[in-house]
Design a protein with these regions (language model features):
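Residues that scaffold, gate, or flank divalent-cation-dependent active/transport sites
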Residues: 1-109, 113, 238
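DNA-contacting surface of Y-family translesion DNA polymerases
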Residues: 10, 202-365
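Acidic, metal-coordinating catalytic segment for phosphate/diphosphate chemistry
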Residues: 20, 326-442
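Short acidic, glycine/serine/threonine-rich loops at helix termini
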Residues: 20-23, 46-49, 156-164, 228, ...
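Short Gly/Ser/Thr- and Asp/Glu-enriched loop/turn motifs at secondary-structure junctions
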Residues: 107-111, 151-154, 294-298, 363-367
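Catalytic palm subdomain of template-directed nucleic-acid polymerases
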Residues: 114-135, 208
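Long, highly charged, low-complexity intrinsically disordered interaction regions
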Residues: 129-188
């Protein structure tokens, strides 16, 4: 097989969180009616996953609890994020019995890409046969069902998974460039395709483009004018082309130099209560910098205010989540430090100053983000020292932070708490019991 003749698998664990909860209860993930959602939250809470049996009844993934028809009997499982991470790691271990880690890209907790090109002769099978073998092994060891897409590049493997396998009785999909054009050039909607969201679909529609076939045949100049360099990706994907390969992914190093913490508050917070949360978040970001051996050149805060019913209705009328986020009234600011720092005192003081200077005192608050910018390694060369800083005091504070980080790493994030964490409006203790904003289950 030539270096240009590749075979990729894209494997997705079906309704992963819901499947894990079914297996934990000794139930069949494919036939059990189950949703993963926190019953302690309101009926507006989002279902993190719904089982295939619920999907068959028309219940869409990521719906809100109140949207589930009342005549459907189902199990509501409280999220257990730590368990899902553990099961995902178990399944990754199954993958490693077939492929080396350099040939696996973990796309998300429930989805991976695999370059199986060099393994087909080793195992004496086709890409589909290897995919079937891996999928059957995962099911046998963990009880979790999976779908699989196969293609000669990462994009076609992903589309084979997302579109073709979804409509296949055996949950397998396989595409090459020719079958992609033959079967999917007229497929609608465009949002079914990887990397095309509602916003891009609307912009393409204004250009008279509603299918991948129309996109492939469209003149390129207007596309580049509208989308800039991203037009190249759209055009390539319209033709089923993807130049990025597994080795490119493995060689990629992020150029991001920031560290952030954000949260959506469970209720509308007044100015004083939100300041408490901002202080907690400042403490958390400072400790994360120490844990990672990093320094920040700046710190910033963004506050999103609560939206009125009228504002939400106007955003929905404009259409799309992007329009909704654009409509959120907000404020914030940034402070640069004399030299990069991870001092808890400096970061805490800066956040309080920014909050007091920039945040409206009369408008309820619902969202907050604290971001450390210009992040560098502690030992990086060329760092300009702050000649006016008290070095001995900073060293003492740094040692305390390292000790706190060590205790939390061993005994959990709630092992060391400050007085502010015990205030009724504080969110830190609850967030410490969460993974990705949802209950960890531990």
């Amino acid at each position: 097989m030539s270096t240009d003749d590749r075979q990729y698998l894209c494997i997705d664990l079906k309704s992963f969180y819901a499947s894990v909860e079914c297996v934990e209860r000794g139930l069949d993930p494919m036939t059990t009616r189950l949703v993963v959602a926190d019953p302690e939250r309101s009926d507006k809470t989002i279902c993190l996953a719904v089982s295939p049996a619920m999907k068959a009844l028309g219940v869409r993934n990521r719906c809100r609890v109140f949207e589930i028809p009342p005549d459907i009997d189902y199990i509501m499982a409280t999220p257990r994020m730590a368990l899902y991470v553990e099961r995902s790691a178990d399944i990754y271990g199954v993958y490693l019995t077939y492929l080396a880690p350099e040939d696996i890209h973990v796309y998300s907790i429930d989805e991976v890409f695999m370059d199986v090109t060099d393994y087909l002769s080793l195992y004496g099978c086709t890409a589909r046969e290897l995919g079937e073998r891996i999928r059957a092994d995962v099911l046998a060891r963990t009880g979790i069902p999976a779908s699989c897409g196969i293609g000669p590049n990462l994009y076609l493997a992903k589309i084979a998974l997302d579109i073709t396998a979804k409509h296949s009785p055996d949950f397998f999909g396989e595409l090459d460039e020719e079958s992609y054009k033959a079967t999917l050039w007229n497929h609608r909607p465009l949002t079914d395709f990887w990397r095309i969201g509602e916003g891009i679909q609307r912009r393409l529609a204004l250009m008279g483009i509603h299918t991948m076939g129309e996109l492939a045949m469209a003149p390129e100049e207007p596309l580049y004018k509208e989308f800039g360099i991203d037009a190249e990706i759209l055009i390539d994907h319209a033709w089923g082309i993807e130049p990025v390969r597994m080795e490119h992914i493995k060689a990629y190093r992020s150029e991001s130099h920031s560290l952030s913490s954000g949260q959506v508050l469970m209720r509308d917070y007044n100015y004083s209560d939100a300041l408490t949360v901002a202080k907690e978040m400042a403490d958390g970001v400072a400790l994360d910098l120490v844990r990672q051996g990093k320094l920040a050149a700046s710190i910033s805060i963004w506050v999103g205010y609560a939206m009125t019913a009228e504002m939400r209705a106007a955003a929905r009328e404009e259409g799309g989540m992007r329009a909704w986020y654009r409509s959120i009234p907000s404020s914030g600011g940034t402070k640069r430090f004399p030299s990069p720092t991870n001092s808890r005192e400096a970061i805490y003081r800066a956040i309080v100053e920014l909050f007091e200077a920039d945040v409206d005192r009369d408008t309820p608050i619902r969202r907050m983000t604290v971001n450390a910018g210009g992040v560098v390694d502690e030992g990086a060369s060329g760092i300009q020292l702050d000649l006016f800083a008290d070095g001995e005091r900073l060293d003492s504070e740094h040692r305390r932070q390292e000790a706190v980080a060590a205790v939390k790493a061993r005994f959990g994030n709630n092992a060391v708490l400050k007085g502010i964490d015990l205030l009724p409006e504080a969110t830190g203790r609850e967030r410490n019991r969460q993974i990705g904003g949802h209950k960890s289950g531990v």
